[in-house]
């Protein structure tokens, strides 16, 4: 099953679109981490190997909460710290036949998109959540997974998560 940005958007809209807002960051950031795990768990690598685990997702909620709980001089600093937290998490993405994952190419893109997202208030939580999901999808799609399809001899592959 491929990565479906609409499913991530729907989960994030459910998290952020509350009648009274979200005054406490901890449960919100934990839910964002769960939504990202759910999104990534639909991914397969270019060798056809399905998602197996992403152990970094358990720390992602805490890392995002730490970013949102501290006082930052600007939204740009918080956005870059969040991008690093997502990068740390995605670096633990595993599929059944994977040998390595490279997430570095997408980090500047994610940082830039999150800086844009956090640089000014959005007219609604829905627009914010959709932009957040789009940024995470664009970032995740740039990760490159390499692995070996079992066989004699094994067949190497390299490509993006889809």
Region locations from a protein language model:
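Extracellular "spike/adhesin" assembly and maturation modules
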Residues: 1-162
């Amino acid at each position: 099953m491929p990565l479906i940005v609409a499913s991530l958007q729907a989960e994030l809209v459910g998290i952020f679109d509350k009648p009274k807002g979200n005054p406490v960051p901890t449960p919100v950031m934990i839910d964002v981490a769960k939504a990202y795990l759910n999104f990534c768990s639909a991914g397969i690598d270019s060798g056809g190997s399905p998602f197996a685990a992403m152990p970094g997702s358990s720390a992602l909620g805490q890392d995002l909460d730490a970013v949102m709980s501290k006082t930052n001089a600007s939204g740009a600093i918080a956005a870059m710290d969040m991008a690093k937290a997502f990068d740390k998490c995605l670096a633990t993405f595993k599929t059944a036949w994977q040998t390595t994952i490279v997430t570095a190419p997408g980090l500047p893109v994610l940082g830039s998109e999150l800086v844009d997202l956090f640089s000014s208030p959005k007219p609604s939580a829905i627009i914010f959540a959709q932009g957040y999901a789009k940024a995470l999808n664009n970032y995740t799609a740039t990760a490159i997974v390499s692995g070996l399809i079992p066989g004699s001899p094994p067949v190497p592959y390299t490509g993006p998560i889809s």
